[in-house]
């Protein structure tokens, strides 16, 4: 049966069946493209109709003193500006990390010991560097992945369906100008059409009875409604531009780097490089190179620790007769800086569970501190607007891209750095207090245990790098699972077992009064031997009774 299935070629639909399916897919693709560009056609047609009606009102004779040629020229100018801004916002690339070469090769599968310089101030939900798995590229600060455009966008604000594209770093200025010009255009149309209706229609009864200008009334209604809604949306985006924020940053919580991360990374970086200030300084380059080679081999071994059980790690069920040798600390690196494979091989389940609880508590503290931090990229309203509109005031009202920056490097605000430094000092003080508490608790427990070890016991030592592992016994053998530890124990006593001892000690002072004579003792011993022989004969036949 399997041979028949293996030899039979895969069936495929014939050409008459595949042709309608391909035609349907092509039609679906065309319909989706037409639906994508429908908002563009709608905006262009609606604004063209509005400017035609508004200019016609100004060119006709009117009783209103301010409706005339100036209002028509103003409407045409706003129409040109808003459509130019709209076109630039639609057809300008908002910017993507994929279009630039920066950071494309920052990730590698090879083990490295050097730590990268963290220039980013935001992290992912897990606290690590932000990386897009769909685009296969690192995400800088303020960059997000758009599921509609199917790519990452630099300084992404939102995906606008009326633009059929994302609003990002390079087209946000044109988008904001489009909102401003459209709001002004709607209010101008509403004012001109409403004034003309009030002065020409309601004051002339015969004219009202004979004809009703439908276009003017419709322009007044649409101009008022769209202008009211769009003005609020424009004011919202102007406030975001003044504060230096995006829509995503305002509506969603931004996760910043932990205040202790840079300090811990710098401390670990010094240890990895072998910064021996008090030790041998003869050949620091050779020593550091040797340490790096040793770290490379150790990382490769840890990555394949589960590939060869029994060689690179202890096999499951294997029991060691002697305690596991302790691994010497490499360049002062604590257990918290070991890889998960190293921690699984050198630490027990209780210690790992304590470490997980500690990590969860640290994540909770990071979330609490994250809510206390101000916006990291708010440089003040003046610098925020200069970043958006550029340094040339003559180009501020023209829809050309004058936004500064490349989308990869962002300058943090002074308030954010001060708040982060204050939180870092507070966290360091809390960690020092916690280490002091564990140090005292460890010393008290060891001093209480020295009475059992004797007067020659060594004094207890404390390792400040492991506050949560202070109760670990370094001489404890490695834990393992074997058939001996998994042997079932019956709650019923075995044959020959008893809760009381069978033999009676003659030297026991509590039983000296009840000890019989020598003859009686000999008879009692013979009876016990006979009972043991009987029990041994029944043991083979009753062994299954020990199992539940």
Swiss-Prot record:
Pfam families according to UniProt: DHHC
Note on domains (UniProt): The DHHC domain is required for palmitoyltransferase activity.
Membrane topology, as annotated: Multi-pass membrane protein
Post-translational modification: Autopalmitoylated.
Organism: Aspergillus fumigatus (strain ATCC MYA-4609 / CBS 101355 / FGSC A1100 / Af293) (Neosartorya fumigata)
Residue intervals of the DHHC domain: 130-180
Side Extracellular, residues: 54-70, 195-215
Stretch list, region Disordered: 313-339, 463-548
Catalytic activity: L-cysteinyl-[protein] + hexadecanoyl-CoA = S-hexadecanoyl-L-cysteinyl-[protein] + CoA
Molecular-function GO terms, alphabetical: protein-cysteine S-palmitoyltransferase activity
GO BP: any one term: protein targeting to membrane
Cellular compartments annotated: Vacuole membrane
Protein name: Palmitoyltransferase pfa3
Major location (coarse): membrane
Transmembrane segments: 33-53, 71-91, 174-194, 216-236
């Amino acid at each position: 049966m399997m041979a028949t299935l293996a030899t039979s070629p895969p069936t495929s639909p014939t050409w008459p069946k595949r042709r309608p399916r391909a035609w349907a897919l092509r039609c679906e693709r065309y319909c989706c493209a037409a639906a994508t560009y429908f908002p563009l056609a709608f905006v262009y047609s609606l604004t063209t109709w509005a400017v035609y009606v508004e200019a016609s009102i100004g060119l006709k004779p009117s009783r209103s003193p301010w409706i005339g040629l100036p209002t028509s020229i103003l409407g045409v100018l706003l129409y040109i500006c808003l459509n130019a801004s709209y076109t630039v916002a639609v057809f300008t690339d908002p910017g993507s990390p994929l279009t630039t070469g920066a950071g494309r090769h920052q990730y590698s599968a090879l083990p490295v010991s050097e730590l990268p310089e963290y220039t980013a101030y935001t992290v992912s939900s897990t606290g690590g560097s932000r990386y897009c798995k769909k685009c296969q590229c690192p995400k800088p600060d303020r960059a997000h992945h758009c599921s509609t455009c199917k790519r990452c966008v630099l300084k992404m604000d939102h995906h606008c369906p009326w633009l059929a594209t994302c609003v990002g770093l390079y087209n946000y200025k044109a988008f904001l100008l489009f909102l401003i010009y459209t709001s002004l255009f709607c209010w101008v149309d509403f004012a001109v059409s409403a004034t003309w209706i009030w002065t020409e229609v309601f004051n002339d009864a015969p004219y009202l009875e004979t004809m009703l200008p439908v276009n003017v009334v419709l322009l007044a209604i649409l101009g008022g409604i769209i202008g009211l809604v769009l003005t609020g949306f424009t004011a919202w985006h102007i406030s975001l531009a003044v504060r230096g924020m995006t829509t995503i940053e305002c509506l969603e919580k931004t996760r910043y780097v932990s205040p202790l991360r840079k300090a811990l990374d710098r401390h670990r970086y010094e240890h990895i490089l072998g910064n021996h200030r008090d030790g041998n300084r003869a050949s620091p380059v050779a020593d550091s190179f040797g340490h790096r080679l040793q770290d490379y081999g150790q990382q490769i071994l840890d990555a394949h620790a589960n590939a060869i059980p029994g060689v690179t790690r202890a096999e499951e069920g294997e029991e060691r007769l002697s305690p596991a040798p302790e691994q010497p600390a490499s360049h002062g690196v604590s257990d918290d800086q070991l890889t998960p494979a190293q921690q699984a091989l050198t630490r027990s389940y209780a210690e790992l569970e304590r470490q997980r609880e500690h990590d969860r508590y640290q994540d909770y503290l990071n979330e609490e501190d994250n809510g206390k931090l101000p916006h990291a990229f708010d440089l003040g309203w003046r610098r925020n607007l200069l970043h958006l509109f550029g340094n040339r005031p003559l180009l501020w009202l023209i829809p050309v891209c004058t936004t500064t920056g490349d989308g990869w490097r962002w300058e943090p605000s002074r308030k954010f750095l001060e708040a982060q430094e204050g939180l870092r000092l507070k966290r360091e003080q809390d960690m020092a207090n916690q280490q002091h508490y564990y140090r005292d608790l460890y010393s008290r427990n060891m001093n209480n245990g020295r009475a059992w070890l004797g007067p020659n016991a060594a004094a207890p030592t404390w390792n400040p790098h492991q506050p949560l592992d202070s109760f670990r016994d370094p001489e404890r053998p490695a834990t393992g699972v074997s058939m001996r530890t998994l042997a079932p124990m019956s709650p019923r006593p075995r044959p020959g077992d008893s809760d009381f001892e069978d033999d009676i000690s003659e030297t026991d002072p509590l039983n000296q009064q009840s000890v019989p004579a020598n003859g009686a003792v000999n008879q009692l011993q013979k009876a016990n031997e006979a009972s043991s022989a009987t029990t041994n004969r029944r043991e083979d036949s009753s062994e299954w009774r020990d199992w539940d």
